[in-house]
Curated annotation (Swiss-Prot):
Pfam families: Aldedh. Catalyzes the NADPH-dependent reduction of L-glutamate 5-phosphate into L-glutamate 5-semialdehyde and phosphate. The product spontaneously undergoes cyclization to form 1-pyrroline-5-carboxylate. GO terms for biological process: L-proline biosynthetic process. The gene is proA. It comes from Vibrio cholerae serotype O1 (strain ATCC 39315 / El Tor Inaba N16961). Keywords: Amino-acid biosynthesis, Cytoplasm, NADP, Oxidoreductase, Proline biosynthesis. Its main location: cytoplasm. It comes from the Bacteria. NCBIfam families: PRK00197.1, proA. This is Gamma-glutamyl phosphate reductase.
């Protein structure tokens, strides 16, 4: 497979997309959503092949859950695409404007990035999310999904390209790297003549490889250890309910809870309530102070080196007792708290201290970490959750897939 051919086609498509009307882009999105429903049988059959091969390969339950499509999930994906149609098109909008002393009218206008390359793992929904957001913002996309989702992604890309064709837009607006060859990923990372941004969605290894090898700007998204700290002033029953939601609702999600930090003053009653709620559902990994208070837990083991740096993506929860909010924050800083973190507290000072000093992309007071999501934030689908500080941070929606240009208008003005 010659990626240069894909790159040239994507760049050419990006020029046409940049001038496409909102109506034309929305037409393609509507067709995409309709075809996801109309072609559900073939999409789910392809996904069943991926699931069967994944089981044969010994994929974890968490990975299989990420890979799985069913009628309800496919319907939710189609609905997400329709929600993108409802969102304002940022392309062409003015960020700000002013009139200079020399009479020039100067504005910053949003424009597409150009060509976005996305490398991701066993999440077929990402294929549609990225295509929808890139299309709405006038960006072409080159996608490279994991080999675990090959058959699913092939069917989804057919739907996307058919929708583009029906709307009179180039099929090369969304292209897929079919071969799982790692060398092709390395080649994509060097294609700065054609690709304007790379977004890797996966584990720390993928992020490291992209940062070390890419000549294209990279936005790191998805990986990070999510924490909840329960302060001594918190309502314990309500805190347990939030912890259960953050851990159990969908443990394979990147915003699911990984580590629970508990203030020493309320550690015993909080952990008793938590164990009563989660026994049989969650395996606990605890440091010595916490473990000494958790004898009633059905599944409990000592925390080992590296456990508090682990994104579990499963029904496993790290637990640590801390002295106060400051120790909780220090623990988070030492253990890659870059994604989503929360404090349960009724103390306004501690809440503000946590919000102002936690280094995460999304920080919550008395709310689950599970809210870090483009749809939950009202952004529509998301292309990634950025855990870095440039160029975007948190869920990357439409505006985060644009840049801007300066536009100056005058009456034949020359600089003096």
């Amino acid at each position: 497979m010659d990626l240069t051919v894909l790159g040239k086609a994507a760049k050419a498509a990006s020029f046409q997309l940049a001038t496409a009307s909102t109506a034309q882009k929305n037409q393609a999105l509507a067709s995409m959503a309709d075809q996801l429903e109309a072609q559900s049988a073939s999409i789910l059959a392809a996904n069943a092949k991926d699931i069967a091969l994944g089981r044969e390969a010994g994929l974890s339950d968490a990975m299989l859950d990420r890979l799985l499509l069913n009628e309800s999930r496919l319907q939710a994906i189609a609905n997400d695409v329709r929600n993108v149609i409802k969102l304002n098109d940022p392309v062409g909008s003015e960020i700000d404007s002013r009139v200079l002393e020399n009479g020039m009218s100067l504005a910053r206008r949003r424009v597409p990035l150009g060509v976005v390359g996305v490398i991701y793992e066993a999440r077929p929904n990402v294929t549609i999310d990225i295509a929808a957001l890139c299309l709405k913002t006038g960006n072409a996309a080159i996608l490279r999904g994991g080999k675990e989702t090959f058959f699913s992604n092939m069917e989804l890309v057919k739907v996307i390209q058919s929708a583009l064709d029906k709307a009179g837009l180039p099929a090369a607006s969304v292209q897929y790297i079919e071969k799982p060859d790692r060398e092709l990923v390395t080649q994509l990372l060097k294609m700065d003549d054609y690709v304007d941004m790379i977004i890797p969605r996966g584990g720390a290894g993928l992020h490291k490889m992209c940062k070390e090898n890419s000549t294209v700007p990279v936005i790191i998204g998805g990986f990070g250890i999510s924490h909840i700290f329960v302060d001594e002033s918190a309502d314990l029953d309500k805190s347990v309910a939030v912890i259960e939601n953050a851990k159990v609702q969908r443990p394979s999600a990147c915003n699911a809870l990984d580590t629970l930090l508990v203030h020493q003053a309320i550690a015993k009653p909080l952990l008793d309530k938590l164990i009563a709620k989660l026994n049989g559902k969650v395996a606990f990994v605890a440091e010595p102070k916490a473990k000494a208070l958790m004898s009633s837990a059905a599944e409990l083991r000592d925390a080992q080196a590296g456990d508090f740096d682990t994104e579990w993506l499963s029904y496993t929860l790290g637990v640590k007792v801390v002295q106060d909010v400051q120790e909780a924050i220090e623990h988070m800083r030492e253990h890659n708290a870059s994604h989503s973190d929360a404090i349960m507290t009724n103390d306004l000072y501690n809440a503000e201290l946590f919000v102002n000093t936690a280094g995460s992309a999304a920080v919550y007071v008395n709310a689950s970490t599970r809210f870090t999501d483009g749809a939950q934030f009202g952004l529509g689908a998301e292309v990634a959750v950025s855990t870095q500080k440039l160029h975007a941070r948190g869920p990357m929606g439409l505006e985060e897939l644009t840049s801007y240009k300066w536009v100056g208008k005058a009456n034949y003005l020359s600089r003096s």
